[in-house]
Amino acid sequence: MDPRTRLDYALFQLTPTRTRCDLVIFSGGENEKLASGIFQPFVTHLKSVSDQISKGGYSVTLRPSSVGVPWFTKVTLQRFVRFVTTPEVLERSVTLEKEIEQIEDSIQANAAAIAGEAEGNELGGTWTSQKSTALSKTKGETDGDTVEENSKVGLQRVLENRKAALCKEQAMAYARALVVGFELDYMDDLFSFADAFGASRLREACVNFVDLCKRKNEDRMWVDQITAMQAFPRPELTFMGDSGIVLAGEENDLLNATNVKHGNSMDASSQGSFETGQEGRAQMAMPWPNQFPQYMQNFQGHGYPPPYMFPGMQGQSPYFHGNMQWPVNMGDVESNEKSSKKKKKKKKNKKKSKQDESAEPSDNSSTETESEDGNEGKKQSRKVVIRNINYITSKRNGAKESDSDESGEEEGFVDGDSIKQQVEEAIGSVERRHKSTSHRQRKHKSHNGDDDSSNKETKGNDNWDAFQNLLLKDNDSEPEELLRISSTALNMASEVVRKREPPSDDSFLVAIGNEDWGRETSIEKFNAGENVRIIRKGNNYDEEMLNPGRSDESRSYSQAEMSVHDGKLRTRNEAEEDWFIRNQAGPETDPSLVKTFVGDHFHLNKSSERDVLTDDSFMIHSRVENQVEDSRLRTEIMDLDVYGTTQQENSAPENTPHEPDDLYMVLGREQDVKPTLLPWTPEIDFETNTLAQRTSRIDLITATKASAGEQTLDGKEKKSRGISKGKDAKSRASSRPDPASKAKRPAWGSRAAVSKSKSEMEEERKKRMEELLIQRQKRIAEKSSGGSVSSSLASKKTPTVTKSVKSSIKNEKTPEAAQSKAKPVLRSSTIERLAVARTAPKEPQQKPVIKRTSKPSGYKTEKAQEKKSSKIGQSDAKSVELSRDPSLEIKETVVEDSHSYLSEKQVDALPAVASVDDFKDIKELHSLPSEETARVKNRPNEIIAEKVQDQTKIDDQETVKNTSVSEDKQITTKHYSEDVGEVQASQEKPVSPKKSVTFSETNMEEKYYFSPAVSEIDISTPPATEADHSRKKWNSEETSPKATAKVFRKLLMFGRKK
């Protein structure tokens, strides 16, 4: 944005804490952030801001009284922000001016005093004023008058110097004000800004600065000083304080400003000697304060650190000091010390070797020198021994005579006594080195403890014997055998070579790597006098611990476990519970066992008892799976009855201790035990089986009760139907998954459990299917007891029809129906009432009863339907479309007096003249379920025990299609006319629209599709066990064979008419 752009308003956007703010200026549709920082200085300088912030809020607006004023611009706000940041930019010049005026007054007073004293003697006064300093230095006069005169002159000179320094500082402050923008031409805008928003301090500073400038511009010396100060580069002239307010675009200037005091641009007290060299020094190109050498180009530099971080400011590292030199390499100091010690030692060895050379004969001086060097250095002593061994073994083992010249020379060179002396000295040096190391580590006494000459002689002879054994050894000997023989010879007088104190007296070998991670091998204990090969554990990482075997000796087992990780051998001490204990034959019952803890070792001290059987059980704390390294320490998950594990040979534990997850008991250490499978939890399976058996038992009990309820009388039929309906709901609910069974399912962790659960689920599914079939058959039997397929469908779809049928059944009871229980007559429609009326001619006394009961029952049925239809609506007119045969459909027609279920093709194809035949077919359609219901009531258990899928429904469907019923069709003319009239009247009613209704999924678990091809004998012929009952049916006049033949003929004719 242009600095001269007129602003609409300025906005202070505060933070939630109202301690910091961003100053944003707005001009037209543009806005720009002008500054950011601490909010308190603005509150102090602007009265309008303090008034607005006292009211609350998170924003303060600076808006002039009139719009578009010329002084409210961006540059005016920038000058105001600079003044708020450093008020001394205007006030410093005025302050210095006041101080200069005071110094001028002092100079004048001092000059007057000096002039008054010098009135009597002008020459003396002049001479004193000019030469006071020279006289005091040369002569050193002690006269009081002379010293007083010299002090006044000195004070005068100091005041003049101070005045000059203040004048230059004032000129510098003025130059800074001009550079920042506080020029006289722009002071009017600042006056207007101060008057509009109540910036009283700004107005006062501007007034004083303008007055000062007017006075100084007349002074030629002032103008020259201003010109000199303006020659300074910009970073020196930019004055930045630590007020915490930063203008946009001046972050780098703030970072580069260093060593600046708050409120001071230059300390006037440091300008006492600023007289002669200041001008020349001011002309020099001042270096930037943060320029660093080439190797520090990436360092951002240390500016004056602000008390806050503002946007765009780069972070600085507070740990680097720019003027600090590179640190001294402390490792070089140690290496220098070590190298100096080595040099001193080498010099000492050289001196000693020179003395030995002077004492030895000249012919073998070189050999003796090397042997003496071997006493001090292990490497040189080895060289001597190896050289002599190679030479002598080559000669002792039969060297060729071809090189006789060389052999002759070497035989003259080698002497047996000298060789023997050299070997003794070499071996003695080795022993002395072992002595020094063992003495430093507080071991046993070394071999050199005795001063007796005889003991030394015996010792030397033993060393020579060991050397002869080495010489007599053939060339094919392995280096390990040589090491074994030499170690046996060296371990004389029960010498124990140990690098570390063992926990107890035990032949327990542990390889412990030193700081070089396994390059060297130390032996904790080596029993004296035993011919045991030294095992270098640094190379055998798979055998970290040598267990001495089963014995009853006192044992000590260290809790320090060894691990090999990434090819490195290391030893660590485990924490509290990451350990294992090898039990020794019942420690809690053995009084001879003493348990002690020494450091990190666990001691088991026990007296030797040969008769006690050793227990090799381990108590092992398990590890987390993701924390165990790849090793042989693996604990298999044990079965509940069988325990087995592999032998735990070594372990690679984790680097950090941890809490164990579980505790396992491992019995035995047989390696041939195979890991068992995941455990089978019998208690979980038992709960599942128990739940399944309980469910099946409840279903069987309910089915038995329902079947027993079907054998009751017709008066209790309503109660039995209610129980069967509740039973259907329960059977449908049982097909859903039980939440309790879900909770008791076995865990899915093992394969055995999964396979067992699958088999059980299959068995349960089969049982459930059988139970569903039994329930289906019982529901079919209940529908058959209802009187017909149509009544059963209507009873399932609409409760009003069921109620009307039940009411008609109750009203139509006759003495004959009450007496003959084997053949109940269920009248649920006009067709069934007509069928009952046909049996009336044999018993005339029952005719009026039948007529009276049929008509009111029809009336009641019609009223019940009309009463309930308002609640149910059109649901009563829905028909059921059976998917058993595509050519078969059932249509439901609702009439006033009855419900007639006719075949759709019969209604469409047959004329009204054939209504009598249709009536007979329909009557036969509804009469068969009554007979089958009687048979079902006599044998309920046989229906429940029936196996197969949909046999009873197939029977019902076949009955609907074939209508093979034997019933007498001969009726009287009177009843025939009445019945035909009723049928014709019912056909005159409008037929309800066709509506396909499918069986609900809640009534059966699956959709069953039935085949119509079923034998008629299965439908019409009753079982052989009911011979008496069937004989009654066939001997009756209604169901005579003659009537059956008529029915078959009608069926054949019915097929032709189609």
Curated annotation (Swiss-Prot):
Induction: Triggered by light. Repressed by COP1 in darkness. The lineage of its organism: Eukaryota, Viridiplantae, Streptophyta, Embryophyta, Tracheophyta. Residues 123-147, 262-281, 330-463, 708-887, 1020-1041 are annotated as: Disordered. This is COP1-interacting protein 7. Residues 340-353, 432-446 have a biased composition (Basic residues). It is found in: Nucleus. It comes from the Eukaryota. Exhibits transcriptional activation activity. Positive regulator of light-regulated genes, probably being a direct downstream target of COP1 for mediating light control of gene expression. A motif (Nuclear localization signal 2) lies at residues 431-438. Its main location: nucleus. Residues 783-808 have a biased composition (Low complexity). A motif (Nuclear localization signal 1) lies at residues 340-347. Keywords: Activator, Nucleus, Phosphoprotein, Transcription, Transcription regulation. The keyword Signal does not apply. A motif (Nuclear localization signal 3) lies at residues 764-771. The keyword Nucleus applies. One of its GO terms (cellular component) is nucleus. Disruption phenotype: Defects in light-dependent anthocyanin and chlorophyll accumulation, as well as defects in the light control expression of light-inducible genes involved in anthocyanin biosynthesis and photosynthesis. Interacts with COP1. GO terms for biological process: anthocyanin-containing compound biosynthetic process; chlorophyll biosynthetic process; positive regulation of DNA-templated transcription; response to light stimulus. Residues 447-462, 757-773, 860-869, 878-887, 1026-1040 have a biased composition (Basic and acidic residues). The gene is CIP7.
